[in-house]
């Protein structure tokens, strides 16, 4: 009775969910009549739209099913190959992580797995979320270097395997962002740990009261080192003493040269202006004489002790009054400056003694200056007739001993004893025979002695 519409014949195709082109339906769709027909037509169109969204459109023909099957196999093969590649990369990374860090606990590993699963990249490559997740994993490995990241790397690779595309897998350096920190080698990790320990020790807090007694007891057993301050002060004091000694030696040489190269009056003025200069000269003189095998004052004192103690002695150039301290005789001490209360300060060419008032006159290393004749004439004046003149002088000052002895005899003396055996000084004994036999204007070249100058060192 009624003609059946064309959509009844097309129903089996809908049940099979076969792809139907929109152009054919648009061309063959008849005008819809009735409420029931409109409902069926809407259902048909909804099913067609759902099938079109899930399946890619293919050309009509008998080869569409074969092409779909080939595409499905191809995609399955690509996914399986990508899974194998990602597993190999995961194993390599797992081995590296096992070398770099020890074991990690299960709870912490699960938390890191959840974090990495959340950051898994979508299809089509590595996204910003994957980079962020990998950065978190690397920061976790840096903060906990004693724990491994085996489970983290495995979960990240599994998520990549499930969502991988046809693109080849990228290396870790290419996939990581430039800001993310690189995985540390074993040597770098050790160096970083050492730097951390050094930084801790630098800012270590002060020791508690309980630790101080323990440390003190340990230090008591050890031998305390010598304080540096004392050694430095000792060295500084030794250096100052050495420099002072050198300066004193230089000044002594200068004063000695002045005494031998000028008259006694100039030397007296020099020491009156600078009394410390005489003290310095005397110290230098004593330092030089100490090196001699025999002091000439000791030899003269030995001779005087063999004579009567009643003899009056005049010591010209007494110094520190060593001769007066060595004999029992009364001694008149004369010098350019006073180092002892017994010393009378004066010029040896003019001593405050009466004529013919002494029995012995002594010149012990004191014939200094250019006016030696004045000294010997003054000794002749104060000596009693037959008095004794003793002269001890440095051996190197004599050029011709006979000439010197001849000149002394012209001044009213005669030689009674001479000792030339000592290597450092000569000793002569003269007896007064009378007043000088020559006038004051007569030249006595034999009385000129060489100055006793010390070498510069």
From Swiss-Prot:
Q: Which InterPro entries does the UniProt record give?
A: RRP8, RRP8_N, SAM-dependent_MTases_sf, UbiE/COQ5_MeTrFase_CS
**Example of a GO MF term:** methyltransferase activity
Give residue numbers for the modification (Phosphoserine): 62, 64, 105, 172, 177
EC no. given is 2.1.1.-
For this chain, the family text in UniProt reads: Belongs to the methyltransferase superfamily. RRP8 family.
Annotated segments matching region Disordered = 52-114, 148-235
Q: What does UniProt give as GO cellular component?
A: chromatin silencing complex; eNoSc complex; nucleolus; rDNA heterochromatin
Positions with a binding annotation for S-adenosyl-L-methionine: 282, 317, 335, 347-348, 364
Quote the subunit structure annotation.
Component of the eNoSC complex, composed of SIRT1, SUV39H1 and RRP8.
> GO BP, one example?
regulation of G1 to G0 transition
Instruction: Show the ranges annotated as biased composition (Polar residues).
Output: 148-165, 174-183
Query: What's the protein here called?
Result: Ribosomal RNA-processing protein 8
Keywords in alphabetical order, please: Chromatin regulator, Methyltransferase, Nucleus, Phosphoprotein, Repressor, rRNA processing, S-adenosyl-L-methionine, Transcription, Transcription regulation, Transferase
């Amino acid at each position: 009775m009624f003609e059946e519409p064309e959509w009844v014949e097309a129903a089996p195709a809908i049940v099979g969910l076969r792809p139907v082109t929109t152009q054919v339906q648009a061309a063959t769709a008849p005008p819809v009549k009735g409420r029931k027909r409109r409902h069926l037509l809407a259902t048909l169109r909804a099913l067609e739209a759902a099938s079109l969204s899930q399946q890619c459109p293919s050309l009509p023909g008998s080869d569409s099913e074969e092409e779909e099957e080939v595409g499905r196999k191809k995609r399955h093969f690509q996914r399986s190959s990508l899974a194998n590649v990602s597993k190999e990369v995961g194993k390599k990374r797992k081995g590296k992580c096992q070398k770099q860090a020890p074991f990690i606990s299960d709870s912490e590993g699960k938390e890191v797995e959840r974090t990495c699963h959340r950051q898994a990249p979508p299809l089509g490559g590595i996204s910003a979320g994957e980079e962020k997740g990998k950065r978190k994993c690397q920061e976790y490995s840096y903060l906990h270097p004693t724990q491994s990241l085996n489970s983290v790397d495995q979960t990240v690779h599994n998520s990549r395997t499930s969502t991988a595309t046809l693109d080849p897998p990228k290396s870790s350096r290419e996939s990581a962002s430039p800001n993310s920190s690189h995985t540390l080698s074993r040597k770098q990790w050790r160096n970083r740990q050492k730097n951390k320990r050094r930084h801790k020790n630098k800012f270590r807090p002060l020791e508690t009261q309980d630790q101080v007694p323990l440390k003190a007891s340990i230090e008591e057993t050890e031998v305390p080192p010598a304080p540096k301050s004392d050694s430095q002060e000792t060295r500084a004091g030794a250096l100052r003493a050495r420099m002072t000694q050198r300066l004193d030696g230089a000044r002594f040489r200068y004063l000695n040269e002045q005494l031998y190269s000028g008259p006694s009056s100039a030397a007296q003025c020099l020491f009156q202006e600078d009394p410390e200069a005489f003290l310095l000269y005397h110290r230098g003189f004593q330092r030089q004489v100490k090196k001699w095998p025999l002091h000439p004052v000791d030899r003269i004192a030995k001779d005087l002790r063999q004579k009567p103690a009643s003899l009056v002695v005049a010591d010209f150039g007494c110094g520190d009054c060593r001769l007066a301290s060595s004999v029992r005789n009364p001694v008149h001490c004369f010098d350019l400056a006073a180092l002892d209360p017994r010393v009378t300060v004066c010029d040896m060419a003019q001593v405050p003694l009466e004529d013919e008032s002494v029995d012995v006159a002594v010149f012990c290393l004191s014939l200094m200056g250019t006016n030696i004749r004045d000294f010997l004439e003054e000794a002749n004046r104060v000596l009693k007739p037959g008095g004794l003149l003793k002269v001890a002088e440095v051996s190197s000052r004599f050029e011709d001993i006979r000439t010197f002895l001849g000149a002394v005899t012209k001044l009213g003396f005669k030689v009674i004893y001479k000792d030339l055996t000592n290597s450092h000084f000569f000793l002569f004994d003269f007896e007064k025979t009378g007043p000088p036999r020559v006038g004051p204007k007569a030249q006595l070249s034999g009385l000129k002695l060489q100055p006793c100058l010390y070498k510069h060192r």
